């Protein structure tokens, strides 16, 4: 089992990074790798080169190929991110746009239709929300976010749905309450990953 933690927050002292560190510690001594997209200066822009690679199903830019290699090592992927305007930050969205592409995460053609390729990967979500749980339920924000990511991305690529653990009221809680909220979310994700450790593994079929 190997877990890839992907974080998208430009502030190194953010709650996102605190959660990232707690999650890494909770998963040890298991195999864990961190992709801090802001620190690594990942370029989220979908360029003409990305568009050509998307339509051709190959010849990916070097930085995209490097992300493919990281994902191919992983059995579990955890996306840790602050919720911006009821969705993921542009940096993380750009990572998805550029990395989860035709020919690698899935194959599609009008003749053969869709063939998902990430069956060997389980994807977990840890969104950090500023508002409370009631607001997310009342306005359908949680359902919309989960539909967009879990169904629109995870299911489409054939990845298995893992656990989703929201941290609510991230800018309003007292420090002690914040720690408790982080404890719950980290425990939910880490226990889900450990519970899979003895389950039969499916070979990862991302494109080399």
What are these regions (language model features)?
Residues 1-104, 176-208:
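N-terminal beta1-alpha1-beta2 submodule of the flavodoxin-like/Rossmannoid cofactor-binding fold
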Residues 73, 90-208:
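FMN-binding flavodoxin-like domain, especially the glycine-rich phosphate-binding loop
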């Amino acid at each position: 089992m190997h877990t890839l933690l992907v974080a998208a927050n430009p502030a190194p002292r953010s709650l996102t990074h605190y959660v990232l560190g707690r999650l890494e510690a909770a998963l040890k001594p298991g195999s864990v790798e961190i992709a801090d997209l802001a620190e690594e200066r990942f370029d989220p822009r979908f360029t003409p080169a990305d568009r050509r690679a998307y339509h051709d199903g190959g010849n990916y830019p070097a930085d995209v190929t490097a992300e493919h290699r990281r994902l191919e090592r992983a059995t579990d992927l955890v996306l840790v991110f602050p919720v911006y305007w009821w969705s993921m930050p542009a940096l993380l969205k750009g990572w998805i746009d550029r990395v989860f592409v035709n020919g690698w995460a899935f194959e599609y053609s009008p003749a053969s239709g869709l063939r998902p390729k990430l069956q060997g990967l389980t994807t977990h979500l840890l969104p950090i929300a500023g508002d409370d749980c009631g607001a997310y339920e009342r306005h359908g924000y949680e359902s919309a976010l989960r539909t967009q990511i879990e169904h629109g991305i995870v299911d489409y690529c054939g990845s298995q749905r893992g656990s989703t653990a929201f941290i609510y009221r991230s800018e309003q809680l007292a420090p002690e309450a914040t720690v408790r909220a982080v404890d719950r979310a980290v425990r939910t994700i880490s226990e889900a990953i450990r519970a899979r450790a003895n389950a039969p593994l499916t070979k990862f079929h991302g494109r080399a």
